[in-house]
Each structure stands twice: as C-alpha cells, then as structure tokens.
Amino acid sequence: MTVQTSKNPQVDIAEDNAFFPSEYSLSQYTSPVSDLDGVDYPKPYRGKHKILVIAADERYLPTDNGKLFSTGNHPIETLLPLYHLHAAGFEFEVATISGLMTKFEYWAMPHKDEKVMPFFEQHKSLFRNPKKLADVVASLNADSEYAAIFVPGGHGALIGLPESQDVAAALQWAIKNDRFVISLCHGPAAFLALRHSDNPLNGYSICAFPDAADKQTPDIGYMPGHLTWYFGEELKKMGMNIINDDITGRVHKDRKLLTGDSPFAANALGKLAAQEMLAAYAS
C-alpha cells in the first residue's frame, strides 16, 4: 500500500502564518544523503587566499498571499561547494549583511551524510558567528586575501541581498580585482545589488533557478504562496543572460563567474570552482 504524502505546506510554529515545504515536496527534492563525490585534490592550495561567503541572515520570505515561507540558505547548495573548495586547500569566512547568524533551510540538511555533516559541525561556528559584511567591505583592497566571493542559494538569498550596497561593493571589488564569483540556484539574486550603481556583470551569462520553476513550486506546497517578484526577470533587465530554462544540474563558467542551476548542481559547481581556483592560485 502506497502512503500518500501531503502537498500542504507545513506550519512553522516559530512565527505567525509561516510555513515549511510540504511533506510531498521534501520527499521529491531533499535527501538524507548528498551526492558529494569527486573530492580528489592531490595538490591542494597552500597559500593565504580564502573564500568570502555572503550568507543569508533572514528566514522569512513574504509570498503573494501574505503567508511567510520559512527559508534561508540551502544546506546542499552551501556545503557541497565549500566542501570541495576546502578540500582543495581554500579556507573560508562567512559574512552576513547584519552580522547576525546565517539562517539555513534545515529541512534540507543531509542529516545522514557521513562526510557533509561532520564538515558542517566543524565549521558551524563560522555560520553562527559571521562577520558583518560592511566591516569586510571597508577593509577590501587590491591585496585582500579573498580569492572568491561565494553566494549560496536558497530563497533566503532573495531577502536583503538584492538591495544591499555592501553586497554591491563586495561584488564590484571582486570583479575589478580579478577574483572569482561563485553562486547557484537563487544565489544570483544577490547580483541585483549592482542594478543601481556600476554593474560589471552586464553581458555575463549564468545558470540560475528558472523563474518558471519558482512559479510551479506552490502547486506542490514547496512554498505557501507565489513569490511577489522573480529574480531571473530582473537579472535579464540588468543585462545578464540566463542560459538555462530547466533544472538539470548544469554549471557554467563565464570568465571568473561560476554558477549552477539548482541544488542538483552543487557538487559539480564545487568541482568546477575548486579546479578553476587551483589553476589560478596553486603554484
């Protein structure tokens, strides 16, 4: 006998009118074990350069019907790329706009993954005690040790990051100083911070989570309502080209901008980022 799982969003009792994804959507799009593989870097980087992770610090995303989606950064999209980069020899720091702790979509955490979970526990304090992004930006110069900026996905990236002058300044610094920018899924929404100032990403191509897919997820209860705006549409208005219209785990490199389409791309993006950064920085 097949047990039917509910497509109704699950109540998040920590906030009024807030909801987690439905049991059905979680059964389709999450797993207790990740697809991490290919972590093989026999000649890791030994220098001082590191990754700056710009993480989400807000959990609740309003939808069109007033209900709140309980979100944050997606664990797979955050941890798998970082696992590869760390194995390749690159340490990382975490910053949020407020300086308050990173919010994760814990309902997507691969709790039974024997590699990812110890890695997360080892670095949890970085996410719980991040730097304030404005303080990081104030210290940036041509000699700063950050080799890349990484913006993880999850719908939490839609909250605050697209309007942040500090996010814009960090991205402008990275591109001006020939650093890598890495992102996937909804993370590229952070690029919208460049809309109202110098936009060095004009003309770049990326992979990202398709707007069309976001418009479908409420049907299975992944979100409790529809988004009030769609980041792909806005990225196109600012001169960026989104090369995918589906979700296949695709990754893409445009100069030093490395992107992926979804959590299914997290492992491949980690490999791509590690390989590209080793080629650029390993002696």
From Swiss-Prot:
Instruction: Enumerate the InterPro entries for this protein.
Output: Class_I_gatase-like (IPR029062), HchA (IPR017283), Prot/Nucl_acid_deglycase (IPR050325)
Name a single GO cellular component.
cytoplasm
Q: Where in the cell is it found?
A: Cytoplasm
Instruction: Please list the coiled coil stretches.
Output: none
- Cytoplasm as a keyword of this entry, yes or no, is yes
The superkingdom of the source organism is Bacteria
Q: Where does Zn(2+) bind?
A: H86, E91, H123
- What Gene3D superfamilies does this protein map onto? 3.40.50.880
- What Gene Ontology molecular function terms does this protein carry? glyoxalase III activity; protein deglycase activity; thiolester hydrolase activity; zinc ion binding
Physiological role: Protein and nucleotide deglycase that catalyzes the deglycation of the Maillard adducts formed between amino groups of proteins or nucleotides and reactive carbonyl groups of glyoxals. Thus, functions as a protein deglycase that repairs methylglyoxal- and glyoxal-glycated proteins, and releases repaired proteins and lactate or glycolate, respectively. Deglycates cysteine, arginine and lysine residues in proteins, and thus reactivates these proteins by reversing glycation by glyoxals.
Question: What name appears for this protein in its UniProt entry?
Answer: Protein/nucleic acid deglycase HchA
- The protein's gene is named hchA
